A protein has these predicted regions:
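Flexible "arm" and connector segments at domain edges
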Residues: 1-74, 78-124
Length: 124
């Protein structure tokens, strides 16, 4: 599935940074436009699955051409995440670690295992 080779996040962020700088795109990458880009690309990923049944989606995930399309859309989403973090000095590793800690408290495994409820639905 994956090559177990570790990918350094900083290296990917730098590749995105240089890609954009080579094209003089910093001027277009304010927080609003980066958020719009992220949302747009996320919706392009979502559109692949629109009006599909569970069975159809499972079949799609077996098709190489469809998997390639999905991979490209995921890469577009990841690009905007990395670019936003790079432009506005957000430490993604710390942000994710902190968020996982918060979610671990909101969604303790012993309470939510096998359930997909929002934390407000099982508190109390």
């Amino acid at each position: 599935m994956y090559d177990k080779q570790e990918v350094e996040l900083d290296g990917l962020i730098n590749r995105v940074k240089f890609f954009c700088e080579d094209r003089d795109w910093d001027q277009y990458h304010n927080p609003k436009d980066l958020a719009i880009g992220l949302s747009t690309e996320s919706n392009e990923l979502l559109d692949i699955f629109r009006f599909k049944s569970e069975a159809q989606m499972q079949e799609m995930m077996k098709e190489e051409k469809c998997r390639e399309h999905i991979s490209e859309e995921l890469a577009d989403v990841f690009f905007f995440v990395l670019r936003f973090a790079q432009m506005y000095e957000i430490d993604l590793e710390k942000a994710l670690t902190d968020k996982l800690e918060k979610n671990n408290k909101k969604y303790p495994a012993e309470k939510v295992r096998g359930r997909n409820l929002k934390y407000t639905e099982y508190e109390g």
